[in-house]
Amino acid sequence: MKVLLIGSGGREHALAWKIAQSPLIDALYAAPGNPGIADHATLVSLDVEDHAAVIAFAKEKAIDFVVIGPEAPLVAGLADDLRAAGIATFGPSKAAAQLEGSKGFTKDLCARYDIPTGAYERFKAAEPAKDYVRAQGAPIVIKADGLAAGKGVTVAMTEAEALAAIDDCFDGAFGTAGTEVVVEAFLDGEEASFFCLSDGKTALALATAQDHKRVGDGDTGPNTGGMGAYSPAPVMTPAMVERTMKEIIEPTISGMAKDGNPFSGVFFAGLMITAKGPELIEYNVRFGDPECQVLMMRLKSDLLPILYATATGTLDKVQAEWRDDAALTVVLASKGYPGAYDKNTPIAHIPEASEEAKVFHAGTALKDGKLVATGGRVLNVTAFGRNVTEAQARAYALADKVEWENGFCRRDIGWQAIAREKA
């Protein structure tokens, strides 16, 4: 099988690494890819926003299957255009990708189909949103409706913080993503990420993970795209997974189909496990970044036939087998992230991978043959262990061998699970 992978982040490096191991693979291309992905795939300098160019390349190379990694091309309808050209594609349609592309769309779906989630209101102007906040009080959550690279959500612990977040959205801090705002109830509990495939009819539960959104140790500082993750998430017991499937995922699949937007691809449900049970915080319509890295480390099965079955409506014919081990990833980011940071800082050394640990590339590039950091989140150091404690020790041991002066990381990834393991 000839496969084209769209994307250039740590998530796509993990997908490329896993897809390349498949005995079914004849050729793997990645557009645009990164220097880490180049170890597993032929890099193609395609502009993925130019759908006609992507289709032309796929036809020229007789590509059998396209896997779309990031959310932006999905929300832009790349999967629709590829499928219309007769090319099997992993990833939802533009209409179904609204589950991630619009927070309000998802909340309205939850309201229609009785999916547990926090109470909410949608606003297109600042003043009514502020009136609502004053009436509700804090803590309260303010979300830019559209795609904001994981940074459009403010969990406001005070009313003043909530009002400032509303101003940020309507003053253009998140571009067009903030032209509408969702204000929702603060949910108290433990967060978890749940991943599940759907071909529009069948659902296949994958695995659970826990992400670390805030930039600083002890979950302090501003939100980021994610500073690290581990899998499995202990809070997601088999009973909780079953409830999540029954109360959240299955009604979403049937609801989307009923509304004329059948969903094919991966559901990444951001959940809050409250006293009542699982409640939906948000949906993403692609593998998490950095959660994908820990999922791929734990997946025993060949990934390629599972993705292909999702794309071709035959998900009921495949299964996914997982290692019992835990996996943990630590994000190395550029100093200053998620604010302003220096670009093109040199990365002097990346340590060799072992059976237990490896480094995935995210925001890296080659400049004059030398590896440099081009993004905010740059490397993902990922390791296995019998438990999270062991996986964490291995990940930090490898992370400390990376030679990059402008990099930093959180030192406490996995702290909640480790506290549980010690107890």
UniProtKB/Swiss-Prot annotation:
Domain of life: Bacteria
UniProt-listed Pfam families: GARS_A, GARS_C, GARS_N
Binding site for Mg(2+): E282, N284
A single BP term in Gene Ontology: purine nucleobase biosynthetic process
Keyword set includes ATP-binding: yes
Enzyme class: ligase
Cofactor: binding details: Binds 1 Mg(2+) or Mn(2+) ion per subunit.
Binding residues annotated for ATP, in chain numbering: 133-193
EC number: 6.3.4.13
Swiss-Prot/TrEMBL catalytic activity: 5-phospho-beta-D-ribosylamine + glycine + ATP = N(1)-(5-phospho-beta-D-ribosyl)glycinamide + ADP + phosphate + H(+)
Record key words, sorted: ATP-binding, Ligase, Magnesium, Manganese, Metal-binding, Nucleotide-binding, Purine biosynthesis
Residues covered by the ATP-grasp domain: 107-312
GO molecular function, one term: phosphoribosylamine-glycine ligase activity
Pathway(s) it belongs to: Purine metabolism; IMP biosynthesis via de novo pathway; N(1)-(5-phospho-D-ribosyl)glycinamide from 5-phospho-alpha-D-ribose 1-diphosphate: step 2/2
Gene3D superfamilies to which the protein is assigned, alphabetical: 3.40.50.20, ATP-grasp fold, A domain (3.30.1490.20), ATP-grasp fold, B domain (3.30.470.20), Phosphoribosylglycinamide synthetase, C-terminal domain (3.90.600.10)
Cofactor(s) listed in the protein's UniProt record: Mg(2+); Mn(2+)
InterPro entries, A to Z: ATP-grasp, ATP_grasp_subdomain_1, PreATP-grasp_dom_sf, PRibGlycinamid_synth_ATP-grasp, PRibGlycinamide_synth, PRibGlycinamide_synth_C-dom, PRibGlycinamide_synth_C_sf, PRibGlycinamide_synth_CS
Keyword field contains Protein biosynthesis: no
PANTHER family per UniProt: PHOSPHORIBOSYLAMINE--GLYCINE LIGASE, PHOSPHORIBOSYLAMINE--GLYCINE LIGASE, CHLOROPLASTIC
UniProt record similarity statement: Belongs to the GARS family.
Protein name in the entry: Phosphoribosylamine--glycine ligase
Organism: Agrobacterium fabrum (strain C58 / ATCC 33970) (Agrobacterium tumefaciens (strain C58))
Protein's gene: purD
